Amino acid sequence: LRAETQDYILDKLSELLRRKTIAGTGQNGTEYKIITIVLDLPKEILRFIQSFDFTKCPPKLIIVNTTETVISLEDSIIVAFLNLIGFDIVFFIPTGYDNVNKYFNNQIMEEHIIGNYLYDIAIPDFNRLRSVKEKKKSFFSRLFG
């Protein structure tokens, strides 16, 4: 990563710790877990952070949870960090369960209830849909190869 990106990540990590957004920060070693998770972000996220121009249009992250499972501490830390660096994050929880706020001290989200609650729905396999779309050729590509 470029030095500017590394400095930006470290500044935002420091701010995340200072704000104590994650429950337990400053107690039981939670701050060490926060540091470890942020400094060990997946390579795809780091590359995206480095290549994205936050001044033009903030990046978007959509998280769909159709189960009763509560978001993990690790995922909560990543979400809080990405929110702090400028990501617009949307949780789509059709069940209406409160399975997101467990590890957040501060209210970092705004809740909107839209329509009826839905249960036992499956998330489509977008990778499969993409491969089917790629296999389909247009009329002209079939004619002209």
What are these regions (language model features)?
Residues 1-34, 110-145:
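Conserved N-terminal ligand/cofactor-binding loop architecture of enzyme catalytic domains
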Residues 1-17, 41, 45, 49, ...:
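Structured N-terminal alpha/beta-domain signature
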Residues 25-62:
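Acidic/polar, low-complexity linker and loop regions
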Residues 60-71:
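Glycine-rich anion-binding loop/nest that anchors nucleotide
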Residues 66-68, 86, 93-101:
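Short beta-alpha junction loops
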Residues 72-88:
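Histidine-anchored nucleotide/phosphate-binding helix
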Residues 101-111:
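Catalytic core of nucleotide-activated saccharide and alditol-phosphate transferases
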